[in-house]
Amino acid sequence: MDALNRNQIGPGCQTQTMVQKGPLDLIETGKGLKVQTDKPHLVSLGSGRLSTAITLLPLEEGRTVIGSAARDISLQGPGLAPEHCYIENLRGTLTLYPCGNACTIDGLPVRQPTRLTQGCMLCLGQSTFLRFNHPAEAKWMKSMIPAGGRAPGPPYSPVPAESESLVNGNHTPQTATRGPSACASHSSLVSSIEKDLQEIMDSLVLEEPGAAGKKPAATSPLSPMANGGRYLLSPPTSPGAMSVGSSYENTSPAFSPLSSPASSGSCASHSPSGQEPGPSVPPLVPARSSSYHLALQPPQSRPSGARSESPRLSRKGGHERPPSPGLRGLLTDSPAATVLAEARRATESPRLGGQLPVVAISLSEYPASGALSQPTSIPGSPKFQPPVPAPRNKIGTLQDRPPSPFREPPGSERVLTTSPSRQLVGRTFSDGLATRTLQPPESPRLGRRGLDSMRELPPLSPSLSRRALSPLPTRTTPDPKLNREVAESPRPRRWAAHGASPEDFSLTLGARGRRTRSPSPTLGESLAPHKGSFSGRLSPAYSLGSLTGASPCQSPCVQRKLSSGDLRVPVTRERKNSITEISDNEDDLLEYHRRQRQERLREQEMERLERQRLETILNLCAEYSRADGGPEAGELPSIGEATAALALAGRRPSRGLAGASGRSSEEPGVATQRLWESMERSDEENLKEECSSTESTQQEHEDAPSTKLQGEVLALEEERAQVLGHVEQLKVRVKELEQQLQESAREAEMERALLQGEREAERALLQKEQKAVDQLQEKLVALETGIQKERDKEAEALETETKLFEDLEFQQLERESRVEEERELAGQGLLRSKAELLRSIAKRKERLAILDSQAGQIRAQAVQESERLARDKNASLQLLQKEKEKLTVLERRYHSLTGGRPFPKTTSTLKEMEKLLLPAVDLEQWYQELMAGLGTGPAAASPHSSPPPLPAKASRQLQVYRSKMDGEATSPLPRTRSGPLPSSSGSSSSSSQLSVATLGRSPSPKSALLTQNGTGSLPRNLAATLQDIETKRQLALQQKGQQVIEEQRRRLAELKQKAAAEAQCQWDALHGAAPFPAGPSGFPPLMHHSILHHLPAGRERGEEGEHAYDTLSLESSDSMETSISTGGNSACSPDNMSSASGLDMGKIEEMEKMLKEAHAEKNRLMESREREMELRRQALEEERRRREQVERRLQSESARRQQLVEKEVKMREKQFSQARPLTRYLPIRKEDFDLKTHIESSGHGVDTCLHVVLSSKVCRGYLVKMGGKIKSWKKRWFVFDRLKRTLSYYVDKHETKLKGVIYFQAIEEVYYDHLRSAAKKRFFRFTMVTESPNPALTFCVKTHDRLYYMVAPSAEAMRIWMDVIVTGAEGYTQFMN
């Protein structure tokens, strides 16, 4: 069904507009939905079991193409071709053209154009089912069904070959034999004509008499409809009520080769109760095509009360007049049956349709035996029939419609008897009513079956014909008087013996004889069919063929001949002047005899005219056979001969039987000549018969011969002579009248030709105008198609633009969401980095606190160490002083003992012992390591950046070693080697060592800063930490250095005193003091350290040049004493005492000079140290300021980042709130909320808007709402109640009939219909959604299960309603999140 529901935008829209053009009613019937329209349409049931929708497909005037790729109706299903078939609608008549594809109607396959009838089921392809609905036709059919009658049965009931079909309530067995159809091999046109002719000839044969004696089926108002449900037939009352033509017609299929599609129209049927429905002529049934009759039909005058009949009704009435049983027996058993069938076959040829009329046969009714009684026996003649009105209700379809000619008042009978011409007119319609016209059946197959069954029957013997005198047991109106008169009359006896009367066969060449039945007794009407049927082919005398009839006072012969009657006669007419009434009156008898004589003359004239007609038929058939030259060319002359023999069969049955078998082989001319000779002989016999019949009739009614009567006989003979004279005059008069009739016929022919010319001109104009109308219609259709295509293109472009806009909008939203995600990720990263920095700052502060505490501890330790070192130094100085004094004493004693001889050289031994006592300390290496460890970072310092080694006195090695050990213990930083350091190798008495005074020295701050800045690989925090540590270390060393300087000053003063004491001692020793003896220790006297300054100048200067930062130790010039021995001679020999005083003075001066230099150097060093401290302090301040600035920048950056993050989050929240489809308010749950004040505060003019009634709790007003089940727009009264917390809507403002309720908890969103979704056309099952009445005023209320579309009466009302409803949208819970 998906494919079916894709009914494609183009055709779907067209179908919708087509359906919308006509009135389409949607009616709710309880749970169901009824769709009704007035135009013919198809109801599509889908293409299979999976299809669920029902589609209405309208069938407009013209052609509608159906297929899988058709432009009109596109269907998808198995077996459907692109253009499967098409349906043509011509003024309400719809015809299906299969186009060679698989199509079935009610299960029967269709191969040729077929007319569609109301309610039929179409199957296209394999499983695409469609039901055809024709509302106008259905309405008309309903009007024709009588009250209480059942609905029509299923149409298209197939007729099986070997079964009995119920037709008109009678069982008619069908034989399976099918006549051979002549298939010519030459041209297609000739073969088709011959085939149609053969089928029509085969179909002319009457029913086989196998159903004799069967009782009719149960009567019902409607018979089974074998003709597509179009013929509504009433069953006959008796077996005589069935007509042969109607039985063929009713069992015919929907379309025969010679019938137009419109020929299967329905016909009204009278119910048994006699109720007459309204006018039953539908407007949609067109006239028959001209294959049966010419279009020119003069208007027919009717008596008062006569109603016009459609051609179908007239034709139907023609079928319903059955022949008599005598005719049945005669046509069935005599060779005339075959002749009649062949003649009738010839009349059905479409080639002769406009020229050769159908043969109408007048037959008299004769009683037959029970063996020959047919189901078509009819009531007796209206002249002998008592007034029984019962058959009126059940016989024939048209009995109630046209008034019977016998309903005329008796006055009309008197008028008719005034003149022979009037009698002639009256007779015309008496016989015209008795004329049996045969309708060609529309089913050739049934006709052929009947023909074959007829040919198999043996001919009727004369004895059987004579036995037909007994009355019929099955007569509907048995009349003893009729039976007696039939038995007493000699002429019926002779006619029954011969099989037929002279008037039995009246072949009327009138194509409209079966179609237009003239119920009114006017000559114009009886001539009308003939004028319309001939084109000048026949002689003018043809028109008298239907004038055989009876005047109001008829002879018994004619009365018996008219006993077949017309079934349309509902009531009988009372007989006037019958033979029984005038048997006692001689004048009446003479008048009666005169009338009989005139009748016989008239009948002879009729026979002559019938012969002329037969000759015309023969000529036409011979001409047709010569023109065709087909297979039937040899058979057609025998048709004419057999037809002529049919006229003689009544008088000479044996001769007719004998001649019928052998005459077919004779030549046409010989057979025709013999026929005319036999007919002339039969005329003479007939005249003699009439005379004897009159005489016997007079003899029957004479009571007893008397003398009186003999005189009367003479008078009667005289009178008879007069009457004969009158008869001659009347004959002349009759001839004149015939001439007048011929002239009038010629005039009528001329009139007909003129009218035909005018009609052709009018038809040409009509066709021209019709073509113009068709062209305009095509232009209109093309214009509509173009407009529709343009509209579709615009809609497609709009849809494309809409999709493009939606894609761009979606991409924009994607970009925004991506940017928001990136911002969010960046903000999170910044927040994480900020948190890490804050944690790092906290850790740094903790480490700084730890380092501060460590620095404090180091300072305390340094103070303690300095105090301990000062104590040790004082103790060592006291020991040194004691040892020196001891040494001096020893030297004096040695001098005194040895007589001035010096001590032996023991300097090297002493130094070796000192080396053994003190561990060798690489002071230079320790100094370099200490300075490198105090540097900033792992980068190697250059040799120029590290301070040089300093010379020191050997006596201070132990102290320096201890200070080094303490420094290693208290230093928190690892010491690393800074590379190879320059070392100076001094003399054996001195070594390059670091003095304690150098502890206060450090590299310049510039080099420290440069080194710090050069270490880019260190993190900032580590560099700052190291800088802090370096600063604190420098401060600690500065304090330490100041303490050491003070200590050195004190020691300088003490050394000055000691030097003065030593100089005094040396002076004393030089001036005669005894030398000291050597101590027990064996140590030689220690050489003064000032001698070290008298080393070679080059070495001293080289060391000074190599070490620019090095200076002399403060102890180097603290002694004022002079050394006793210089160089390697340390003894104070007496030889040198003379020059010692001069040298001592020079040394003292030099020492003072050196002391001054040392003081100057000391001051310079102090100033430089102060400058360094100041620079270091400034650098620290700058670093502190820079760090504070960086921290402030970091704090401001983090604050700004925090503000940015908060701002972004706020922006997103704001955008999210703005993206809500709600208006600017959220649902308000407060109980004391004033709705009117709230709406007025929003800027709405409530008082000026007349469409809304607003109070503090309730809002009321009209809105147009789209329905849920049926998508149509209805005006509803809406009530928004905050007390009940509902939005309900009613039919009107009385609020009595509630249509629906929307609870506040279900309302999710209220928004303007900006997408115009309510204005788009869509399909909901098979109902169409019409677009919004005003899309600009449409808004939507979304609930959990449905979306309501509402249209406000004005823009202000729409805004008020949206703001009102949104205060109750409690289903919108997103804002709570």
Curated annotation (Swiss-Prot):
Segments of skewed composition (Low complexity): 252-273, 456-473, 653-663, 971-992
Q: Could you confirm whether the keyword Coiled coil appears in this record?
A: yes
Q: Which residues form a coiled coil?
A: 683-809, 1144-1208
Where are the stretches annotated Disordered?
150-187, 211-334, 370-535, 653-707, 936-1019, 1119-1138
Q: Which GO terms describe its biological process?
A: basement membrane organization; regulation of microtubule cytoskeleton organization
Q: From what superkingdom does this record's organism come?
A: Eukaryota
Positions of modified residues (Omega-N-methylarginine)? 512
Q: Where is the composition biased (Basic and acidic residues)?
A: 309-322, 481-491, 677-691
Residue stretches of biased makeup (Polar residues): 165-178, 288-303, 1009-1018
Q: Which residues form the PH domain?
A: 1256-1370
Keywords from the UniProt entry? Coiled coil, Methylation, Osteogenesis imperfecta, Phosphoprotein
One Gene Ontology cellular component term attached to this UniProt record is:
basal cortex
Q: Which SUPFAM superfamilies match?
A: PH domain-like, SMAD/FHA domain
Q: Which residues carry this modification: Phosphothreonine?
A: 522
Q: What CDD domains does the annotation carry?
A: FHA_PHLB1, PH_PHLDB1_2
Q: Residue positions of the PTM Asymmetric dimethylarginine?
A: 131
* UniProt signal peptide: none
Q: Show where the FHA domain sits.
A: 64-125
Phosphoserine: which positions carry it? 51, 192, 220, 223, 324, 334, 381, 404, 430, 443, 461, 470, 489, 501, 518, 520, 533, 539, 551, 555, 563, 578, 583, 678, 971, 1017
Record-annotated membrane-spanning stretches? none
In the record's own words, the domains note is: The PH domain mediates the binding to phosphoinositides.
Using the UniProt entry, name the condition the protein is associated with.
Osteogenesis imperfecta 23: An autosomal recessive form of osteogenesis imperfecta, a disorder of bone formation characterized by low bone mass, bone fragility and susceptibility to fractures after minimal trauma. Disease severity ranges from very mild forms without fractures to intrauterine fractures and perinatal lethality. Extraskeletal manifestations, which affect a variable number of patients, are dentinogenesis imperfecta, hearing loss, and blue sclerae.
The protein depicted here goes by the name Pleckstrin homology-like domain family B member 1
Q: What is the lineage of its organism?
A: Eukaryota, Metazoa, Chordata, Craniata, Vertebrata
Q: What would be the name of the gene that encodes this protein?
A: PHLDB1
